[in-house]
Amino acid sequence: MDRIRRTERLAAMTQMLINAPNRSLALSTFCETFDTAKSSASEDLDIIRTALKRFHLGTLETLPGAAGGVRYRPYVEKEDAFAAVNALCERMSAPGRVLPGALLYIADLVGDPAALERMGEILATEYYDVEPDFVLTMEMQGIPLAMMTARALDVPVVIARRSVKAYEGAAVHITNPVGSSFKTMSLPKRLVKEGQKTVIVDDVLRTGGTLSGMRSLMDEFRVTVAGEAVLIATEEAYQADPDVRPLMVMEGVDAATGAAKIRPGDWLRG
C-alpha cells in the first residue's frame, strides 16, 4: 500500500468512528488499518477529539483497560438540541396539519431520515449514562425514531406488536386500555432477557395507554424501564406523566388560524 498521508488517515478514522456510534474501537484497529504506530494513531485521535468538541459534533472518549479503546458518541449539547427541536416545532405548526379529532399530521416527519437521525441523537444523549440493553417501541410509527435512537446508543430495537407470527416463537401477551378500547400487545420471549434495562421510545403520547402497556409488558419480563421518550405529546398527557421526555409538546390549536401550537419539551431547556 502507498504511504498514507495524515490528512487521509484523519478523514478515514473520523468516518470509522462516526459509523460506529457508542462502540469501543481498539487503538490497534487504527494501527493495523492504516499501518501506523500507536503514538501516531493516538495523536490523530486527539486531533479528532478536539475538532469534535470545538464544533459540537459529539464526544470522543478514551476507555481504560486491556479491552479499552476509544468511543465516539454523537452527543448533542442542550442548546443545540433545543434549536433543532424548535425548528421542527415551527415545521409542525404550519397551517393544515391539524386533522379531525385534534390529531396532528406527522407522517412526513416520521419518514424524514435526516430529522429523525438528529432526534435519535438527542434522545441517545439523554440516556447514554443509563446504558440500556435495548430500545423498546410499539409498531408502527414509533419504529423510525426508535431505530435512530438505538443506532446512536448501539443497541438493538425491540418492537412490541398487536400480534405475533408463528415463526417468532412463544410470546408474552397482555391486554391494555388504549383510548376507549382494549388492545393486545405481544412480544416474543426470545427478544428480551430478565434483568435487562430498556428505554421506551414511541411516536405520540396522547392517552398514555400504549406507554402503560409497554411498561406492563416489561414488568412481565422483569425488565427495568430506565427512560421513556416520545416524538410529541399533548400538553395534558405531558402534565399527567412528567417523567416522559417528549421532544415536542402540542399545547393546543390556534382558533384563529387552525394551526397547532407546539413547543419543545421542557427538559430540553437545560
Residue ranges and their predicted role:
Residues 132-139:
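Short glycine-rich phosphate-binding loop at a beta-alpha junction
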Residues 58-73:
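Minor-groove-contacting beta-hairpin "wing" of winged helix-turn-helix DNA-binding domains
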Residues 155-199:
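Short, glycine/charge-rich flexible loops or terminal/linker lids adjacent to PRPP-binding catalytic cores
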Residues 71-131:
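Active-site-facing substrate-recognition patch
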Residues 26-58:
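N-terminal helix-turn-helix
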Residues 202-212:
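Acidic, divalent-metal-coordinating active-site segment for phosphoryl/phosphodiester hydrolysis
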Residues 216-270:
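PRPP-dependent phosphoribosyltransferase catalytic core
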Residues 1-26:
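Extreme N-terminal segment that seeds HTH/winged-HTH DNA-binding domains in transcriptional regulators
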